[in-house]
């Protein structure tokens, strides 16, 4: 039982004195299923509230796995307690035992909707605008709180092979991009909203951030010492490029086994903004869509669109007309 002022989530405190939860407090309230997924910092379960029978996502961080894991858990808790937005997966409950952190979040079940869309053979501009608009509004909200997500991306499966080989393969034929890694449909309804998840790498922007994180393709900071909110807008430009064309904007034709030269060449292209709107994949894409991608992937951070500016770009009205 927590002493003192009641906490909105479990018994987590960051003061000098800690009142840890007993593991039984977690299992008394929730049924934890089998592991759904193991990630770099945590294990993910489906959990059922024993009283309401409502299903949640549970993320378990093991303290014994090291300082980075403990930092990731604390960071995700801190950020998620600050935010409330319809396009951000909400934190419901938190417990800290002596050995673990347990985070209970809303359960998003709609990844299969991406499969349905990609089964049609392409991701239309209208489909893409529906995704990008919602994510952009969430990112603009985060940025208003000076929060940088730093890890917006699509899954690496398949992408690394396209990037590594330099072969331009369209997404449906290649079977990649079955879902966005931390951008998911909330449910399986046709008009489901999009939600952002995974905030363990997010950071409060107190001045410019120094340490790089995330995937180089989405972070044009590989050669920069400091960066901030513009990095999320760059990432959204990369995501928009991939959704519209089925291909990554940056790839290198160096042999897969020549990792050092491959990485150098890829990073050079990212830093130079060296990408093209390749035919035939971009032949039927509107000029306004290409304009938004270009403004989001502007190498000069000072010239790059902010999330709020991107929301007002003409592309959205062009698609809706």
Regions found by a protein language model. Give the residues of each.
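Conserved N-lobe beta3->alphaC-helix segment of eukaryotic protein kinase catalytic domains
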Residues: 60-83
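Conserved end of the kinase activation segment
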Residues: 221-230
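Terminal C-lobe "cap" of eukaryotic-type protein kinase domains
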Residues: 298-321
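Conserved short submotifs of the Hanks-type protein kinase catalytic core
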Residues: 99-112, 116
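A short, aromatic-enriched beta-strand patch in the conserved N-lobe beta-sheet
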Residues: 93-94
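Glycine-rich ATP phosphate-binding loop
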Residues: 43-63
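Activation segment signature within eukaryotic-like protein kinase domains
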Residues: 131-132
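Protein kinase glycine-rich loop
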Residues: 33-40, 44
């Amino acid at each position: 039982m927590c002493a003192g002022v009641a906490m909105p989530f479990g018994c987590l405190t960051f003061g000098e004195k800690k009142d840890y939860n007993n593991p039984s407090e977690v299992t008394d309230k929730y049924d934890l299923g089998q592991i759904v997924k193991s990630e770099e910092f945590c294990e993910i379960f489906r959990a059922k509230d024993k009283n309401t029978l409502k299903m949640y996502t549970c993320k378990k961080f093991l303290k014994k796995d090291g300082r980075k894991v403990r930092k990731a858990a604390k960071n995700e808790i801190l950020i998620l307690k600050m935010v409330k937005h319809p396009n951000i997966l909400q934190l419901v409950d938190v417990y800290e035992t002596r050995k673990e952190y347990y985070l209970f979040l809303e359960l998003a079940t709609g990844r299969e909707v991406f499969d349905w869309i990609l089964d049609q053979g392409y991701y239309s501009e209208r489909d893409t605008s529906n995704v990008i608009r919602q994510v952009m509004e969430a990112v603009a909200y985060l940025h208003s709180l000076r929060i940088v997500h730093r890890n917006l991306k699509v899954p690496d499966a398949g992408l690394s092979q396209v990037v590594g080989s330099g072969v331009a393969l369209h997404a449906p034929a290649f079977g990649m991009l079955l879902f966005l890694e931390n951008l998911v449909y909330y449910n399986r309804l046709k008009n489901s909203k999009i939600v952002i998840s995974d905030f363990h790498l997010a950071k409060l922007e107190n001045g410019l951030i120094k340490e790089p994180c995330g995937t180089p393709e989405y972070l044009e900071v590989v050669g920069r010492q400091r960066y901030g909110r513009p990095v999320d807008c760059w990432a959204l430009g990369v995501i928009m490029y991939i959704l519209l064309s089925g291909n990554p904007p940056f790839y290198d034709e160096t042999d897969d086994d020549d990792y050092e030269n491959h990485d150098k060449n890829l990073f050079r292209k990212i830093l130079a903004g060296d990408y093209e709107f390749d035919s035939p994949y971009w032949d039927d894409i509107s000029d306004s869509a290409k304009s938004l991608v270009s403004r989001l992937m502007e190498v000069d951070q000072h010239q790059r669109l902010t999330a709020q500016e991107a929301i007002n770009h003409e592309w959205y009205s062009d698609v809706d007309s």
